[in-house]
């Protein structure tokens, strides 16, 4: 079971003002999150400020996200939201055809139609149980295109995570996604019509929403080039992945290319990197720039990660499943500071998992790459 803390503007205000009871509760929250990795942050007032215009116009309130943390849709006595997702593999970004996002959006709308057809065939208790789901899907046809392989793409282009170049690419990708998906949404409305909920809101679009960033933990493993998960950073460049069929050795695709280019792909080097928890900062055959490019999540400034998430949220009408990563080298003050950054940023709707590497000690590069 996954749970979330509902964090309000009032709570954030009290925390900023130094309220003793609020600080004690905050410390308990951080302790539990670091101990278990769980307890999502649901900034409910922020989510309602940032929800899609359709739901603002109808005054439909968002109460929570989903089992992950990328959904920002309302639910009430009449509606239960549905989660319709498709993802683009960013390792193929440079070869994306012109109308890829248009096609992805149309595919999702087809999925919605198919889902409604299935629900229409339900009878008896099943029909009653799914009636609120069916009503929401029919009225709003909310969908969300996401991505996997964000960090893989940065490595592919030899861009440092959090650098000015990475921010420019971030802007380029997600602004294009928003524009293309909106074009497809308008076209579908003209060709196939506008659902009743959107009509009531005065929004003449086929789909109430178009974008969200789900975790893609499983789908990324099955995708071409083995991209990194969603918009989150790589946790280890070489690692053993446990599976039902046994343990599998996983080497980051972009780093494997570099190893082969430099003639360093051998068992000894693989074992050495694995013994360093997938970090390559001790590899003397890498240049400093290459070491910076291939920093793993526990070495990347979490402030830079949040900055990139905040930047792209302007283009996303739902939200992102944002993970944070901390190691044994990180102080309690640093962990609290990063979480507070997420609380205070109105473009961060919430937080997903918190990963910790208790046995690994990493040197986190906490200097702003843009300022260097």
Say what each PLM segment does.
Residues 69-75, 116, 211-372:
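Catalytic alpha/beta core of large soluble enzyme barrels
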Residues 3-11, 115-149, 154-172, 293, ...:
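Conserved alpha/beta enzyme-core scaffolds, especially Rossmann-like or related mixed alpha/beta domains
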Residues 101-134, 138, 158-216, 288-292:
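Internal maturation/activation junctions in enzymes
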Residues 2, 6, 10, 21-28, ...:
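Generic recognition of stable, solvent-exposed alpha-helical segments in well-folded globular domains
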Residues 1-60, 147-198, 319:
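Conserved, charged catalytic cores of large soluble enzymes
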């Amino acid at each position: 079971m996954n749970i979330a803390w509902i964090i309000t503007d009032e709570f954030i205000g009290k925390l900023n003002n130094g309220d003793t009871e609020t600080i004690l509760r905050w410390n308990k929250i951080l302790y539990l999150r670091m101990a278990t990795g769980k307890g999502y942050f649901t900034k409910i007032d922020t989510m309602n400020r940032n929800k899609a215009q359709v739901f603002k116009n109808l005054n439909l309130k968002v109460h929570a996200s989903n089992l992950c943390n990328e959904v920002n849709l309302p639910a009430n006595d009449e509606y239960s939201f549905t989660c319709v997702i498709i993802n683009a593999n960013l390792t193929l970004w440079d070869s994306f055809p012109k109308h890829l996002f248009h096609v992805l959006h149309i595919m999702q709308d087809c999925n919605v139609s198919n889902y409604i057809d299935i629900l229409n065939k339900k009878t008896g208790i099943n029909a009653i149980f799914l009636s609120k789901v069916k009503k929401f899907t029919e009225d709003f046809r909310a969908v969300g295109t996401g991505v996997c392989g964000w960090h893989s793409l940065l490595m592919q282009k030899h861009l440092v995570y959090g650098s000015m170049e990475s921010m420019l690419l971030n802007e380029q990708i997600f602004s294009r996604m928003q524009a293309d998906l909106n074009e497809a949404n308008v076209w579908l409305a003209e060709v196939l019509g506008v659902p009743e909920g959107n009509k009531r809101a005065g929004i003449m679009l086929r789909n109430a929403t178009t974008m969200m960033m789900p975790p893609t933990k499983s789908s990324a493993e099955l995708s071409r080039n083995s991209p990194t998960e969603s918009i989150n950073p790589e946790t280890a460049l070489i690692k053993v992945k446990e599976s039902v069929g046994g343990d599998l050795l996983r080497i980051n695709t972009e780093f494997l290319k570099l190893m082969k280019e430099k003639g360093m792909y051998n068992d000894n080097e693989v074992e050495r990197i694995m013994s360093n928890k997938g970090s390559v900062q001790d590899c003397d055959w890498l240049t400093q720039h290459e070491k910076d490019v291939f920093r793993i999540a526990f070495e990347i400034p979490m402030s830079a990660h949040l900055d990139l998430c905040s930047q792209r949220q302007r283009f996303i009408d739902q939200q992102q499943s944002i993970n944070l990563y901390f190691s044994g080298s990180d102080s309690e003050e640093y962990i609290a500071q990063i979480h507070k950054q997420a609380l205070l940023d109105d473009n961060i709707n919430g937080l997903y998992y918190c990963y910790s590497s208790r046995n690994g000690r990493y040197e986190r590069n906490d200097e702003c790459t843009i300022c260097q």
